[in-house]
Curated annotation (Swiss-Prot):
Start-end of Low complexity biased regions: 30-44
Name listed for the protein in its UniProt record: Small ribosomal subunit protein bS1m
Annotated compartments: Mitochondrion
Gene Ontology cellular-component annotations: mitochondrial inner membrane; mitochondrial small ribosomal subunit
PANTHER family the UniProt entry points to: MITOCHONDRIAL 28S RIBOSOMAL PROTEIN S28, SMALL RIBOSOMAL SUBUNIT PROTEIN BS1M
Keywords, ordered alphabetically: Acetylation, Mitochondrion, Phosphoprotein, Ribonucleoprotein, Ribosomal protein, Transit peptide
Assembly and oligomerization: Component of the mitochondrial ribosome small subunit (28S) which comprises a 12S rRNA and about 30 distinct proteins.
Species lineage: Eukaryota, Metazoa, Chordata, Craniata, Vertebrata
Matching InterPro entries: Ribosomal_bS1m
Transit peptide: 1-72
Residues carrying Phosphoserine: S74
């Protein structure tokens, strides 16, 4: 083994080269129990692990980075549920009774218009007699809310029963600036 680790005769000026060659030649002569058929060309880099081992290394590295980012994250960005609820549009709106909202017709069955206004439940309103053909799927309408959830407690029941609908009165179509300008152009012609 001492023969394998012997440094080559190098001039005194290249001390770094001596140390480098000594460490390179000693690397293969350690505790490995090979047949001595190691290649003399030890300048090749070690092969990277492949397959599952490399995937596991990458996954572990990503987990470490994510953990570091989580620990460094400022608590200002994290909002509590109570804070989110307090600042939600539904809570800011206050009591729903007699509020005017905008909804969109998403389903029609005969003369029943199913309107989504962004609440917990949709509402069902009758199609008006006047200009009923204007109320098509996708049309935006104005509503006056009466109740966000129709519930009732039946005789002898201990819990409320809901029909999964809100109660609202259909006020009419939502008029946009574009529709007003189109009507004015028609009247002027």
């Amino acid at each position: 083994m001492a023969a394998l680790c012997r440094t080559r005769a190098v001039t005194a000026e290249s001390h770094f080269l001596r140390v480098f060659l000594f460490s390179r030649s000693c690397r293969g002569a350690g505790t490995e129990s090979g047949s001595g058929s190691e290649s003399s060309n030890s300048t090749e880099p070690r092969p990277r692990p492949g397959g599952f081992a490399s995937a596991l290394e990458r996954h572990s590295e990503l987990q470490r980075k994510a953990e570091l980012a989580r620990t460094r994250g400022s608590p200002k960005n994290v909002e509590s549920f109570a804070s989110m609820l307090r600042h939600s549009p539904l809570t800011q709106m206050g009591p729903a009774k007699d509020k005017i909202v905008i909804g969109r017709i998403f389903h029609i069955v005969e003369n029943d218009l199913y309107i989504d206004f962004g609440g917990k439940f949709h509402c069902v309103c009758k199609r008006p007699e006047v200009d009923g053909e204007k109320y098509q799927k996708g049309t935006r309408v104005r509503l006056r809310l009466l109740d966000l959830e129709l519930t009732s407690r039946f005789l002898g029941a201990t819990t409320d029963t809901t029909i999964l609908e809100a109660e609202a009165v259909l006020l009419g179509l939502q008029e946009s600036k574009d529709s007003k300008s189109k009507e004015e152009r028609r009247e002027n012609k």
